[in-house]
């Protein structure tokens, strides 16, 4: 007997677009001399004393086992000939905006998950095209022709399957998962490939002898619920290709922030407050981009000994005024206990966000 009802909406047409090695691909596009060479987006460990992490890398670098979140030091050890590039977020954001405008030609129901991936619901699209595969191919063509980059696309009747499909054939792949093929497609996948199943859950599933979608399909609903609570029911549905989560074109952001890690530790108050100011102005630019105002300002400070302090102040009214955010963030810093070691990381974040297009003066100078 099922504890929760199983409702499977297979009427939708969902596309998941995932840009191929996005940051690295932009750098290769802008500097053709990089093509065919291992490119890592991250600080060169030879210049930082071994500090820093890999943001992303191109497919040539991945041949050496380099991946996102790996330490730059390990990436260099794996591939000493790798070319390290610090990266240019403003440039990547501009390209990301260009790609999103392409999406909007086909549908307004677009849910960006990050700067380089998004879900699109094309069930009722602007051009009246019945085939989601055709739309995915048109988007791939438009992005290549206009932006000079490749992307991978997954097409299915829900977000879960579309996401898995986009990762199935990279780079520049297109995979369709029909409702009649979903169980077979999932059965062959390692459980760690299931989107939304984290590392700890994977370890627990392995302990239960569950390694593939086929293994998961064989486990009774109550067994999964006993081990994982309500998430067990989610696993039960995933094994059957069921996910009715809508594509949310108005996806709510809970916070907007900017933080930076420093290769050279910060000691002087003037330097520290100058960096707080930079982060505050970056937050204001992001608030403006997303048409948001915020009420709570959060300052994050991490010291060289990795002690991290976070403190917040909630304002009486919503704002996105750079001078106010900067002043509050600096005043928060002044209240922190003295620390004898340098600062490794500083971050400013705005939470309690609301949509409000009031005429607010933006001081970005």
UniProtKB/Swiss-Prot annotation:
PROSITE patterns: UMUC (PS50173). It catalyses: DNA(n) + a 2'-deoxyribonucleoside 5'-triphosphate = DNA(n+1) + diphosphate. The record marks 23 as: Substrate discrimination. Its EC number is 2.7.7.7. Mg(2+) binds at residues 18, 116. GO terms for cellular component: cytosol. GO terms for molecular function: damaged DNA binding; DNA-directed DNA polymerase activity; magnesium ion binding. Its cofactor is Mg(2+). Monomer. Poorly processive, error-prone DNA polymerase involved in untargeted mutagenesis. Copies undamaged DNA at stalled replication forks, which arise in vivo from mismatched or misaligned primer ends. These misaligned primers can be extended by PolIV. Exhibits no 3'-5' exonuclease (proofreading) activity. May be involved in translesional synthesis, in conjunction with the beta clamp from PolIII. NCBIfam families: PRK02406.1. This is DNA polymerase IV. It comes from Streptococcus pyogenes serotype M3 (strain ATCC BAA-595 / MGAS315).
